[in-house]
Amino acid sequence: MPVSLTPNAITAIHDGDVNLKPLLQVLEIKMIGRSQERSQERYRFLISDGVSAQHAMVAVQLNDRVKSGQFEKGSIVQLIDYICSDVKGRKLIVVLNMETIVQQSETIGNPTIFGETDTEAQKTFSGTGNIPPPNRVVFNEPMVQHSVNRAPPRGVNIQNQANNTPSFRPSVQPSYQPPASYRNHGPIMKNEAPARVIPIAALNPYQGRWAIKARVTAKGDIRRYNNAKGDGKVFSFDLLDYDGGEIRVTCFNALVDRFYDVTEVGKVYLISKGSLKPAQKNFNHLKNEWEIFLESTSTVELCPDEDGSIPKQQFSFRPISDIENAENNTILDVIGVVTSVNPSVPILRKNGMETHRRILNLKDESGKAVEVTLWGEFCNRDGRQLEEMVDSAFHPVLAIKAGKVSDFSGKSVGTISSTQLFINPDFPEAHKLRTWFDYGGKDTASFSISRDTMPGGVSRNEIRKNVSQIKEEGLGRSDKPDWITVKATISFIKTDSFCYTACPLMIGDKQCNKKVTRSGTNRWLCDRCNQESDECDYRYLLQVQIQDHTGLTWITAFQETGEEIMGCPAKKLYAMKYELEKEEEFAEIVRDRLFHQYMLKLKIKEESYGDEQRVKMTVVKVDKVNYTSESKYMLDLLVR
């Protein structure tokens, strides 16, 4: 069947027609190498409609098809998706998707470069020898995968449109048009038509006007910052469109107030009039080289009548075995069956702020397991639900979107602000894992790539000792402190000096906390700050006796661990005993804390007191015993 090139296609594209789906011939293919501005190679085609020819840049997602020979000099192709941008006064066609109709053909017609003068037009050619290259244009297209399965027809005769024989009819692909809710909605500037809706993959900084239709898949909290310009606030949300393209949108200051409550995860929006800037890959894990920054003229409009064609979420799951070779700080998606969940524990950050941490373990069909660390609200919201499920002997499937790889003491995955957790999700990967686990996977041995976890969630780096071993093995008497974990019961708490008066003044963003004394003016004096205060703080300095089946010893618990043991602030107990003089109530609180068993992580170090050397044991972490995890740990010891 003869095939004809689409007449006047180059002219139509220059005039803004992006829905034509024309048949054109490839006259030249040239690879443009990498440079400092480009992160990867690009290809430039010379395409012709038989009369006019025009250079076109090919999006990087088509690189593999160019390298495999699907497109070559002389090929007849159909442009499926493309844009025409104005760059420095020159028109630039960017081909986002195309298909080969005929693999090879002689040059059709006598084409000339579009827009040349009559004199230049006399320089017709057969091939591309006399075609001057356009000005160099540099930009990067985001990497997006497109699947094209149609094989090109074979043995097709090719001719120019001047021949009256029947012509091949191009296939019609769905075009991107503004939805009905967008047309005639809101104020539009005079002589300004609504921007054409394009795929996220087609976005680049060289476009004047654009619009995208996409679903919000994730939304961050409002973050506040302070820099040389003053205080500010920012939030971001992630978008996913019909073609699987993803991009992050960021708003600052007044735009936070304008758009934060407007955007909602799961809803579809029409977004236009933002600026594109290079994505900050330290904070942005999406597979897109650009990021949208909304401006005062930007619009974000809800599409209430969306048809569900845009997926709810997009995953790119990695098997746990692959995570073992992933680089530190890699952002990835992982799915597995939860085998254990540890209790949530408070953690003091370097800035003095407290957060929570919860550790769980995942396994999958790859024969590997990995430790997952939940931080902050993930501990309470999702972590508690997972813990209840596992404690009731049900092991849920957990999908993690945008987890961060850590290589500290083996490989593990942790949550970040943009992480999303999906418990027992309804998609094929989850159903497959569920079936695998229920029909044999549960009893299949899995090697942990975290290396610091053992059955029951116990740390491999955790050194378990009993009380008698501390003295017998001379722990703490070397140059470096020893760190051990003891399962012991609190048998006695000294109450004569259970706390000390602490400095409440701030040094930077941290409280001083050094001991203060009464001055001559009856105020509190801090030698470190060299300042006086009207009030002081009260912080724990608990002397606690612990014992197990091998013996007993004394340990010291400071503020955070002291509060964990006593269950209330030191200031409350001080006021009860010394100010309110409620001795019996105070004694009852202390008695209530005795004879409870804990997992105590201790720092053991020899220190000098005058001329005497003493081994001091300080509590750095207090956990209630998780009997489910502890039973698994003890069973593992028996097996070994």
From Swiss-Prot:
Coiled-coil ranges from the UniProt annotation: none
One Pfam family of this chain: Rep_fac-A_C
Keywords recorded for this protein, A-Z: DNA damage, DNA recombination, DNA repair, DNA replication, DNA-binding, Metal-binding, Nucleus, Zinc, Zinc-finger
GO biological process: chiasma assembly; DNA repair; DNA replication; male gamete generation; male meiosis I; pollen development; reciprocal meiotic recombination
Chief localisation class: nucleus
C4-type Zn finger ranges: 503-529
Listed GO CC annotations: chromatin; nucleus
Cellular localization per UniProt: Nucleus
Family in the record: Belongs to the replication factor A protein 1 family.
Purpose: Component of the replication protein A complex (RPA) required for DNA recombination, repair and replication. The activity of RPA is mediated by single-stranded DNA binding and protein interactions. Plays an essential role at later stages of meiotic recombination events required for the formation of class I crossovers. Is essential for normal progression through meiosis in pollen mother cells. Is involved in repair of double-strand DNA breaks (DSBs) induced by genotoxic stresses, but does not seem to be required for the repair of meiotic DSBs.
NCBIfam families: rpa1 (TIGR00617)
Name of the protein in question: Replication protein A 70 kDa DNA-binding subunit A
Organism per entry: Arabidopsis thaliana (Mouse-ear cress)
